């Protein structure tokens, strides 16, 4: 399914297929803001093993590399996930996806720029330190996980980034400037979304800031794992254009309705 509005294009399909078609059509985007499915941590992820998951990410972001303009940024929300223990005699395992992902992206050709730490309220985390709280044995200590990562990459370009800035008109530069308060460090305190029907929703504040910091007004933003459409709504709030791709029909319908309402 394909839905188009004045400032958005929404695709219900496999992101590899859709991005391939867009690339063959000569389409390019100015920024990517996305959150890939968690490895075996949500109901929509399905890989036989972790190596298959990393291969999926490599294939997906290789296409993203091709569709992204030279010198532009790709912002990816990822989290360390816990693989539950299968029986009491086994230990659970934390899988450091964000750290492995950097190697995947550098292999593709991206340049690593920033690691932004998204900190959520402590009450939003699953309790991991109950045993330690009771026994207080040092090697049993497990902190509650209240952070995720936003990893920012750049597609290499010839010359300095000033070359891109000069491509925009003076009015575009002025209207896109960040006025007032902004995030001064790489630690962002943002409450998670709680009302969304999506199982792993973006809080709107997160993509809205990334869009404002890494693109100009009327730029084209891509989210190939659109989910409930929060990146698209962020584009509406910041006067950008949006391309969204979602493979799940139910989530696509949810995001379509939400984005159509936002762009009215």
Label every model-predicted segment:
Residues 1-254:
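Core catalytic lobe of class I
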